[in-house]
Regions:
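Sec-dependent N-terminal signal peptides
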Residues: 4-13
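C-terminal motif of bacterial Sec signal peptides marking the signal peptidase cleavage site
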Residues: 15-17
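A detector of repeated loop/turn-to-beta-strand junctions in beta-rich toroidal repeat architectures
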Residues: 40, 109-112
Length: 183
């Protein structure tokens, strides 16, 4: 009986010792577990880790322009731009040190600055202004962020009011595997 008990304990120990460790197995995830052998679906992703290539920019809102109180323009704006030559920003790269660079279609650096995230708000400090964008989607392959642009003013008797939501939809252009393994 004692031998049977030892045999049962030994077999139980072998089966529990052979259990695969679960965790995030994606190397660009913020919670990557190099010891995990089985992906448990828990991967969380950051805005860093490759560049974001803009696929479309959606704009919706309204604009009014009046002259001496008389409406000249009263428009509802609603369109989506997908032509790569017209997308601005085209390519954004966010680094782990909280810096970013923007590149055009020829991969020429257009500007750079700093960034931070608090909750679902991405704050981008450009050379001449600070932008606050709401992160709608952020996963391994997709980034969607929205900024609300509100401007109003009067110049030479012409008054304008603009209220536009601009949504940028981008896909991740991942760094090479070798770059990730070097980390």
């Amino acid at each position: 009986m004692k031998k049977l008990l030892y045999l049962f304990l030994a077999v139980s120990f072998i089966f529990t010792a052979c259990k695969k460790e679960q965790g995030c197995t994606d190397a660009i995830a913020t919670n990557y577990n190099a010891d995990a052998e089985e992906d448990d679906g828990s991967c969380a992703f950051s805005i860093t880790g490759g560049s974001w290539i803009t696929q479309s920019i959606e704009q919706s809102g309204n604009m009014t322009v009046s002259m001496m109180g008389i409406p000249i323009i009263d428009s509802v704006i609603n369109y989506t731009e997908t032509n790569a030559d017209s997308l601005d920003p085209y390519k954004l790269t966010f680094e782990d040190d909280n810096t970013y660079t923007e590149h055009d279609q020829l991969n020429t650096e257009v500007e750079s600055g700093t960034w931070s995230i608090s909750g679902d708000v991405l704050t981008v400090n450009t050379p001449d202004t600070t932008l606050s964008l709401t992160l709608n989607t952020l996963n391994k392959d997709n980034l969607s962020m929205t900024i609300n642009i509100i401007e109003s003013g009067t110049e030479d008797g012409i008054t304008f009011d603009i209220n536009i939501d601009q949504k940028v939809n981008a896909n991740r252009e991942s760094k090479r595997w070798d770059d990730w393994m070097a980390k």
